[in-house]
């Protein structure tokens, strides 16, 4: 007979593997009783084999009537609490608590092993689940008679794929339309899988066409999908690995859960806010399960003293991963004692405390193991009381650890760092290490012993493990927490321990691709001189000052705000984006600009009789129009209500200044208007506010007034796939700093040694100042250039040393002594004031004309490559003060206007025509199609010169600016090249 390549054949492979290799029983559909939604035969068999005395005591199986009461009660508990909770905690019937599952045993408990083996894992195919129709589910898995999973299988060989399985669930498996289908009801079955021979998707709540299926795939080359399986079907890991008894038990015990979340919403009738509770059914995604299991396994095998960097993209579910990791770390054993005494979670998200606490309370019967520590007192109490999981905000952690003392060195810790790039600088990390290791200076030691203890304390401590989570690892983060590998050239690179890439998250639909619809605008200005004479100013300083001045002019704010309001209404609201629920964010460069935009946007909204309003968000207090104001003063409601109010009308536009650009997860955000220079991590984090998925969200939009496409692309490219540190930092950079400082001759070795001895012996402050002041007086005698070089090198040393000391094995008493000396000295050195060579500039000018012009729409495409980044640069510091280039105001304005102003219509006409003309250049088109991007760019530059020269008679002024002004040439080239290069290649 030929091979069975039908859907039934795939079903047979799965079922027979679970039965023959994984030890499952194979059930039949009649075992499942539709009126109770359970396999009554196996429930009864499990209880009688493990808790017969309870069955006798309650008489639950004495006769048909008692049996009916028992199963009715069990069914009600499943509906109320969910199958995962009933399995973990059992359920009460009359006077007894019935266990419905026996957990995985430890190796030291043979009795628990005996009971675990009595669990009944069962696989049933073609299960008829409804009393109202004859529909059947391809596969159901049950545990002790309780359904935990269903599967619909499809097969490419018969012309059906996973999409058909999903549609089957959405169209034919709706519990709201068939109340007899208890198997499909929320919580009663933990998860529903759609499976074909290539892909797996999962859903935890069936609700008709709104059923949301998420990928449960391994990923391929940093993207979506599953790798080829040399010994079988791509998706066989589901039944060969995930659904093994041990693996499935682990998921049910430590991952699957029902979480209750409260949310404040406005009552539409009363207008008042009220709390609404919603239940979420959680099942781990593949990468979460894989990452947590790998970290737990490495911790079991390697004990403490390890580092793990987890590069998981936005949308990866880091909060749940951190919760599952923390909860299971405290349960690891070293023989019969806990492997870790406490797990400390360091985060900058206040809401993570309640999230972890709520999630952990859903497991087993453990209570009160999570403590929120916002001071040294609460941390000490938490440790003293044996709190297993301690959560603290990153900016409190330094203060807390400085006050801990030395009594922690005999304890073992797990430190989970949420968004490691923002919470780990060298100094903070060093203090964390000192606090946990107990390596702080104490009385009774000589100076060398004390300094050696501090050096050791700066290093990654041996009595702790670090688990660092971030989507955007910087060089320092990779070097501090990444896994080292020696390359063929002898250099040591650092890589993440585990990754779930931005590329995979986008391809799997967990986050939106925020670069798909990216529109850039440019501001053109013409400034005129308002004084008769022609004063001179520093050319470089003047250009910066002019740019800042024109950007804050009322006309500039007005034009940009008008573009924002018009776009939001016509292209977002009127087009019904997100079913009419879409929100927007305006990113500004500072608080004053944010307030200006807030008032102008609200004025324009009111002018067009819009029903919507804006909210402004910034931290602290700011003087505005002669009055000190806060965001609450301007908005008219407390700051704590900003996030909730953004979900309710009339508020639709959030105007921010360095706030809500990180950690703000609002799926209703659809559009972003950027008026701030963004680079590297900040660009990724800011634009990623748009990437949260929502059932009604099919696209996003960015309108950028301040950045070009290449800058944004370069920022995202670093974190699109795996980020790798190419080599480790060179400790000799510290010697470079020292050499630069020593050239100034402001201290002696004896002074450094004497100050250290006095400082670490705790002498009076009065004994320190005379030593430090010797260097201060010598510093004041230096010329200005040497002062700049010396002070910047001191700051560079102080910034670099704690990091180098933490990540390298080198010890240096000299470096530690200098660190102490410079730490005191730098605060007493006089502040160096840069002389203002632009004084009077603003009073001598006026804004004559300005216009904000659209440059083009783009889909920014990222390269399918990993990114190598270099260690943080550690140079010698500034070489001194540069001489001002004094230039006449008329010349400064000519250059500024040349870049920022031309006849708008003619300029726009040229920008519109240039792409078509350059696409007619055969040399460029060949280079674009057949060479790499760099070669195509070189040919483009040559071709553009010829094209512009041929346009001389059409627009002399434009051509003159292009040929004579390199900055203007680059401005035009950058924009035109990106446009035509993409067009030429998309037409291939």
Language-model-detected regions and their locations in the chain:
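Conserved segment of the helicase C-terminal RecA-like domain
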Residues: 689-718
């Amino acid at each position: 007979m030929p091979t069975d390549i039908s859907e039934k054949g795939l079903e047979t492979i799965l079922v027979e593997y679970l039965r023959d290799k994984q030890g499952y029983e194979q059930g039949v559909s009649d075992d499942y009783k539709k009126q109770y939604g359970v396999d009554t035969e196996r429930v009864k068999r499990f209880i009688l084999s493990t808790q017969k005395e309870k069955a006798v005591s309650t008489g639950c199986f004495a006769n048909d009537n008692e049996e009916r009461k028992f199963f009715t009660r069990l069914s009600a508990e499943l509906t109320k609490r969910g199958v995962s909770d009933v399995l973990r905690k059992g359920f009460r019937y009359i006077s007894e608590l019935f266990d419905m599952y026996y957990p995985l045993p430890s190796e030291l408990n043979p009795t628990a092993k005996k009971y675990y083996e009595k669990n009944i894992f069962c696989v049933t195919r073609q299960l008829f689940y409804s009393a109202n129709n004859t529909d059947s589910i391809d596969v159901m898995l049950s545990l002790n008679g309780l359904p935990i999973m269903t599967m619909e299988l499809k097969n490419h060989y018969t012309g059906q794929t996973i999409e058909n399985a999903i549609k089957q669930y959405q169209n034919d498996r709706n519990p709201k339309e068939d109340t007899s289908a208890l198997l499909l009801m929320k919580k009663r079955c933990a998860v529903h899988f759609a499976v074909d021979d290539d892909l797996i998707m999962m859903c935890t709540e069936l609700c008709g066409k709104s059923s949301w299926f998420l990928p449960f795939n391994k990923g391929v080359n940093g993207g979506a999908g599953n790798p080829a399986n040399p010994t079988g079907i791509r998706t066989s890991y589901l039944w060969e690995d995930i659904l093994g008894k041990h693996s499935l038990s682990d998921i049910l015990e430590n991952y699957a859960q029902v979480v209750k979340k409260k949310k404040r919403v406005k009552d539409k009738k009363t207008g008042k806010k009220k709390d609404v509770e919603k239940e979420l059914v959680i099942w781990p995604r593949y990468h979460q399960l894989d990452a947590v299991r790998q970290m737990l396994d490495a911790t079991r095998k390697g004990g403490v003293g390890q580092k793990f960097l987890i590069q998981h993209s936005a949308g990866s579910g880091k909060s749940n991963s951190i919760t599952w990791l923390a909860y299971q770390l405290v349960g690891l054993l070293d023989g019969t004692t806990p492997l870790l005494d406490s797990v400390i979670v360091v985060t900058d998200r206040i809401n993570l405390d309640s999230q972890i606490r709520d999630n952990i309370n859903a497991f087993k019967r453990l209570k009160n193991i999570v403590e929120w520590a916002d001071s040294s007192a609460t941390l000490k109490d938490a440790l003293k009381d044996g709190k297993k999981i301690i959560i603290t905000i990153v900016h409190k952690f330094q203060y807390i650890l400085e006050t801990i003392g030395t009594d922690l060195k005999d304890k073992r810790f797990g430190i989970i760092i949420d968004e490691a790039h923002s919470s780990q600088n060298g100094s903070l990390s060093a203090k964390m290490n000192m606090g946990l290791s107990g390596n702080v200076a104490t009385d009774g030691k000589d100076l060398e012993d004390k300094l050696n203890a501090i050096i050791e304390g700066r290093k990654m401590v041996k009595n702790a493990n670090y688990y660092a989570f971030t989507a955007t690892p910087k060089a320092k983060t990779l070097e501090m927490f990444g896994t080292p590998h020696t390359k063929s050239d002898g250099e040591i690179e650092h890589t993440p321990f585990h990754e779930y890439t931005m590329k995979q998250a986008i391809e799997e639909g967990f986050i939106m691709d925020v670069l798909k619809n990216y529109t850039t605008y440019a501001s053109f200005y013409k400034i005129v001189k308002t004084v008769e004479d022609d004063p001179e100013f520093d050319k470089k300083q003047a250009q910066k000052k002019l740019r800042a001045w024109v950007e804050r002019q009322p006309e500039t704010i007005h034009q940009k705000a008008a573009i924002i309001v018009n776009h939001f209404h016509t292209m977002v609201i009127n087009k019904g984006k997100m079913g009419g629920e879409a929100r927007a964010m305006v990113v500004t460069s500072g608080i004053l600009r944010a307030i200006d935009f807030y008032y102008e946007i609200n004025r324009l909204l009111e002018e067009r009789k819009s029903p919507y309003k804006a909210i402004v968000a910034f931290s602290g207090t700011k003087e505005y129009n002669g009055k000190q104001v806060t965001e609450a003063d301007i908005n008219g409601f407390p700051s704590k209500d900003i996030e909730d109010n953004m979900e309710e009308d009339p508020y639709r536009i959030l105007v921010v200044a360095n706030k809500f650009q990180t950690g703000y997860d609002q799926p209703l955000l659809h559009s972003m208007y950027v008026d701030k220079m963004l680079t590297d991590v900040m660009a990724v984090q800011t634009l990623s506010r748009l990437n949260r998925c929502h059932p009604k969200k099919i696209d996003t939009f960015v309108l950028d007034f301040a950045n070009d496409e290449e800058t944004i692309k370069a920022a995202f490219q670093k974190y699109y796939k795996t980020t790798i540190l190419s080599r480790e930092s060179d400790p000799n950079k510290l010697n470079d700093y020292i050499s630069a400082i020593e050239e100034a001759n402001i201290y002696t070795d004896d002074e450094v040694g004497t100050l250290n001895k006095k400082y670490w012996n705790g002498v009076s402050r009065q004994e320190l100042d005379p030593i430090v002041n010797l260097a201060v007086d010598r510093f004041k005698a230096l010329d200005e250039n040497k002062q700049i070089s010396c002070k910047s090198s001191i700051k560079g040393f102080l910034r670099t040393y704690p990091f180098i000391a933490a990540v390298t094995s080198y010890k240096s008493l000299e470096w530690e002594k200098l660190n102490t000396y410079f730490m005191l000295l730098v605060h007493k050195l006089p502040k160096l004031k840069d002389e203002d060579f632009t004084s009077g500039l603003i009073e001598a000018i006026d804004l004559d004309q300005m216009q904000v012009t659209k440059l083009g729409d783009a889909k920014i495409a990222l390269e399918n490559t990993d990114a190598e980044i270099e260690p943080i640069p550690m140079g010698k510091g500034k070489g001194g003060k540069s001489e001002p280039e004094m230039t006449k105001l008329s010349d400064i304005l000519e250059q500024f206007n040349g870049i920022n102003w031309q006849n708008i219509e003619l300029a726009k006409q040229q920008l519109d025509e240039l792409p078509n003309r350059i696409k007619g250049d055969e040399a460029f088109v060949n280079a674009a199609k057949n060479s790499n991007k760099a070669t195509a760019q070189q040919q483009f530059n040559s071709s553009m010169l010829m094209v512009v020269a041929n346009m001389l008679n059409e627009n002399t002024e434009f051509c003159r600016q292009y040929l004579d002004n390199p900055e203007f040439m680059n401005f035009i080239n950058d924009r035109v090249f990106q446009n035509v290069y993409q067009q030429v290649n998309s037409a291939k």
